[in-house]
Amino acid sequence: QITVEDMAAYSGVSPRTLTRQFADQLGVPPARWLLERRLAATRALLEETDLPVETIATRIGLSSAVNLRRRFNTALRTTPGAYRRSFR
């Protein structure tokens, strides 16, 4: 699981500096950007595979299926299961 701290260490700056520069350049904080990438990967996996939500959560770097469901529902206003069914 990639964190803001990992990104900052890789970039050779503090997490605070990374957050500021990241938001200045991309318009969103790095944590939000990471979550958006994870949710995009989740959507692709739900559309293209039959992997269980638990496996998808692990694969995209979230701690649990519960965490994935909560974040998915907050962002997309639907559950991962309902989203997958809409592509079947």
Please describe what each predicted stretch is:
Residues Q1:
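Short glycine/proline-centered loop/turn elements that form peptide/ligand docking sites
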Residues V4-E5, D24-A65, R85-R88:
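Terminal helix-turn-helix DNA-binding modules in bacterial transcription factors
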Residues D6-A9, T17:
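An amphipathic alpha-helical interaction segment
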Residues A8, L51-P52, R69, T78:
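Extended, subdomain-level signal for the structured scaffold at the beginning of enzyme domains
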Residues Y10-S11, F22, I60-G61, F72:
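Core residues of bacterial helix-turn-helix
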Residues V13, L62-S63, T78:
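The short coil/loop that forms the "turn" connecting the two helices of the helix-turn-helix
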Residues T17-Q21, N67-R70:
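Base-recognition residues in the alpha-helical recognition helix of bacterial helix-turn-helix
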Residues V66-R88:
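…primarily DNA-binding HTH/wHTH and HhH modules…
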